[in-house]
Swiss-Prot record:
It holds the Pfam family Pribosyltran. One of its GO terms (biological process) is pyrimidine nucleobase biosynthetic process. The lineage of its organism: Archaea, Methanobacteriati, Methanobacteriota, Methanomada group, Methanopyri. Orotate binds at residues 119, 147. The keyword Transferase applies. It comes from the Archaea. It catalyses: orotidine 5'-phosphate + diphosphate = orotate + 5-phospho-alpha-D-ribose 1-diphosphate. The keyword Glycosyltransferase applies. Its cofactor is Mg(2+). Keywords: Glycosyltransferase, Magnesium, Pyrimidine biosynthesis, Transferase. This is Orotate phosphoribosyltransferase. GO terms for molecular function: magnesium ion binding; orotate phosphoribosyltransferase activity.
Length: 183
């Protein structure tokens, strides 16, 4: 194992990518913590550690694909480390140029979805639909953090297994340890 879960969570906290407080998520839900993997990815050592950890849980596949914006640095570095081609799934088709929604070739390939954080699974499901429309097959998804708020179940209903490096329980455990240490 490259690095334990607790140390990864500590690294996120150290670079300001893990915050505790009162936050509104993109899903509209409120949360007592916020994970900003995009911020974490701006720190080379953290990006390296996160992608090493993702590599450990990465299932077999032909192509790695992730939705813009959060997955782009992760899928890029992971592609190099795994020696696999990558694809980026845009939120919507471009209105100019080629007009494509997916950058990279997924047609007829087994695609592993990669993302930063999974809450309800909405962005992963949107990426899944785009990949399937282009003729790709998705059976697995990997994320840095599973917030344990329905993504695993939503993906399972579509025949996709979700693996994560960290969970909400891991992050709350760190928060509780920090609170205890401060007394």
């Amino acid at each position: 194992m490259v690095m334990n879960r607790e140390r990864l969570a500590e690294m996120l906290l150290e670079v300001g990518a893990l915050k505790f407080g009162d936050f509104v998520l993109s899903s509209g839900k409120r949360s007592d913590y916020y994970v900003d993997i995009k911020e974490a990815c701006t720190h080379p050592k953290v990006l390296d550690a996160l992608t090493d950890a993702l590599l450990e849980v990465l299932p077999d596949g032909d192509v790695l694909a992730g939705p813009e914006l959060g997955a782009v640095p992760l899928v890029s570095v992971l592609s190099v480390k795994a020696g696999l081609p990558m694809a980026i799934v845009r939120k919507r088709k471009k209105e100019y140029g080629t007009g494509e929604r997916i950058v990279g070739d997924v047609r007829g390939r087994k695609v592993v979805l990669v993302d930063d954080v999974a809450t309800t699974g909405g962005s992963l499901l949107e990426a899944l639909e785009a990949i399937e429309e282009e003729g790709g097959e998705v059976r697995d998804a990997v994320v840095v953090v599973d917030r344990q708020e329905g993504a695993e179940e939503a993906l399972k209903e579509r025949g996709v297994r979700l693996s994560s490096v960290l969970t909400a329980d891991d992050l709350r455990g760190l928060r509780d340890a920090e609170s205890t240490a401060r007394g």
